[in-house]
Amino acid sequence: MPRKTPIERYRNIGISAHIDAGKTTTTERILFYTGVSHKIGEVHDGAATMDWMEQEQERGITITSAATTAFWKGMAGNYPEHRINIIDTPGHVDFTIEVERSMRVLDGACMVYDSVGGVQPQSETVWRQANKYKVPRIAFVNKMDRIGADFFRVQKQIGERLKGVAVPIQIPIGAEDHFQGVVDLVKMKAIVWDDESQGVKFTYEDIPANLAELAHEWREKMVEAAAEASEELLEKYLHDHESLTEDEIKAALRKRTIANEIVPMLCGSAFKNKGVQAMLDAVIDYLPSPADVPAILGHDLHDKEAERHPNDEDPFSSLAFKIMTDPFVGQLIFFRVYSGVVESGDTVLNATKDKKERLGRILQMHANERKEIKEVRAGDIAAAVGLKEATTGDTLCDPAHPIVLERMIFPEPVISQAVEPKTKADQEKMGLALNRLAQEDPSFRVQTDEESGQTIISGMGELHLEILVDRMKREFGVEATVGKPQVAYRETVRTPAKDVEGKFVKQSGGRGQYGHAVITLEPNPGKGYEFVDAIKGGVIPREYIPSVDKGIQETLKSGVLAGYPVVDVKVTLTFGSYHDVDSNENAFRMAGSMAFKEAMRRAKPVLLEPMMAVEVETPEDFMGNVMGDLSSRRGIVQGMEDIAGGGGKLVRAEVPLAEMFGYSTSLRSATQGRATYTMEFKQYAETPANVSEGVISAKVK
């Protein structure tokens, strides 16, 4: 079956924003204008097509990134048909894992900003993730009809806060209630949308006289940015500022956007049906197709570097980036195809796990409606049914040409809670439900506390766990009682402990046990656990050395202070002895474990606690209350700045997670509900002695 749309006409984009910048509304309008969705779904009444989980509709926030396909021929029907795959990404801090995961499979992103709030804390997190995966982006300043809207302020903030070079390719005509349309700086025409047709119809008009000077000033800046794309253009531009043609300007801006040097900037009001189609045109004009992105690198099964080019001729390779449980078809695995072609019914290799599986049906999604398709090709995003083994981050590829694309790295959870089923009947269902949810979301972990037998769930924040418990109830019908949130402490050591021995000997007639290991333990900040074999002269036979390492790794799960996991330690195995008859793997595993426990006691063990980067936006009158409250929570204030547009202050602080429980309630009462905050994990830091004493005694009781 030949390709319907050439790969050059594909755009895989994410729409990313801070909560309430209007991202879901923007996506809805895209679906409306591209003719997929006939009635515009409003988030205000909870009917948005992309937000397809019940809780999202209640909370009005987007949680799971749904992938949707739309087609676009340009606002004026002046392009050949392009295929735009949109991945909707959440804008809430507890869901950064979702954003990170979708960034990995995007070729370009559209950053949506609120014209009043501008660049907010979460926007910075998303921007950093886009930088990490080198995703080219355009910016859309939404809600230009709101009181206090200021397009140029947002342009400045992108430079100051995000260090991005924002190049407006439009400027707004009017703002707030008088927002009518935009001036297209490339065509130097005004675009005015018609309200009757919900913005489907529009007209090109002359630039209003009162904006002529401003439009020329910003066009000059835009053309200058375009001219820097090449020596030839720069010379042509310097010779005559007006000599660059519309096509030359677009091609040059495209080149610089794809190189991540500039961010073209547009504006509009999705809610008022203005500006969204021009943004779609910009997606086609400036964001890359899969063919514009360099070949993707990976490793074959022998760890040799391998690459795949974005075309149909290379062997099939793809990355699974999301798993969802669907009530009708069971598990859906969303995957992005980087190269080659695959048909439903084909056998694919899960190279990450080295297991072959048969690809059942392939579905293309529109929010949560689905269309079955026979095959997918390079550049496509689709969902597969019938893969049992795949989890997020796995590579699915052609069995004859194995490749492992890079692994996604997921953050460790920082908060945990005990959950107990309310009835005996819920007991079994709960285990099943939790495993399903953990499969979908790698930042969510489930384990059983060995001492108490309780089930412990861990995640990225209170809201994250709250939503998962809620999903358990709705999707799996499991009622559960949730314990108080607990902090995920860690243990480590501060000083080295040299030549500490562990000896496990049981010799009382018959076959005995004999294992003897001598280790040196030292701090290993930020590097995790490291094991070094420094045995000379065969004092411990080769085959027993991995057992010592295994014994130590088992002991790492529970430290000597309060039984928390041990991190950032380096262990060197220096000496030991063995017995010809009595030594075995188990004896050396025990010896390793004993040596490590003793070494840790001697190496000044300390407790580490998760520190959170907290940002509070507050009216100036409540500054004192907010700062005082943060200090009382052992917070270290790291900076303050004015919120642009006279909207109060932004306070940045680092606060231990242990002190942040119930913060939203106390912030509300301290500021009469007028302050907002965001918080995300920053790092682990040593817990002060007086605090760790309390934690240890509470745990040891």
Swiss-Prot record:
Gene3D superfamilies: 3.30.230.10, 3.30.70.240, Elongation Factor G (Translational Gtpase), domain 3, P-loop containing nucleotide triphosphate hydrolases, Translation factors. GTP binds at residues 17-24, 88-92, 142-145. GO terms for cellular component: cytoplasm. SUPFAM superfamilies: EF-G C-terminal domain-like (SSF54980), P-loop containing nucleoside triphosphate hydrolases (SSF52540), Ribosomal protein S5 domain 2-like (SSF54211), Translation proteins (SSF50447). Residues 8-291 form the tr-type G domain. Transmembrane segments: none annotated. It is found in: Cytoplasm. Its main location: cytoplasm. InterPro entries: EFG_II (IPR041095), EFG_III (IPR009022), EFG_III/V (IPR035647), EFG_IV (IPR047872), EFG_V (IPR035649), EFG_V-like (IPR000640), EFTu-like_2 (IPR004161), G_TR_CS (IPR031157). GO terms for molecular function: GTP binding; GTPase activity; guanosine tetraphosphate binding; translation elongation factor activity. GO terms for biological process: ribosome disassembly. PROSITE patterns: G_TR_1 (PS00301), G_TR_2 (PS51722). Keywords: Cytoplasm, Elongation factor, GTP-binding, Nucleotide-binding, Protein biosynthesis. Belongs to the TRAFAC class translation factor GTPase superfamily. Classic translation factor GTPase family. EF-G/EF-2 subfamily. Catalyzes the GTP-dependent ribosomal translocation step during translation elongation. During this step, the ribosome changes from the pre-translocational (PRE) to the post-translocational (POST) state as the newly formed A-site-bound peptidyl-tRNA and P-site-bound deacylated tRNA move to the P and E sites, respectively. Catalyzes the coordinated movement of the two tRNA molecules, the mRNA and conformational changes in the ribosome. This is Elongation factor G 2. The gene is fusA2.
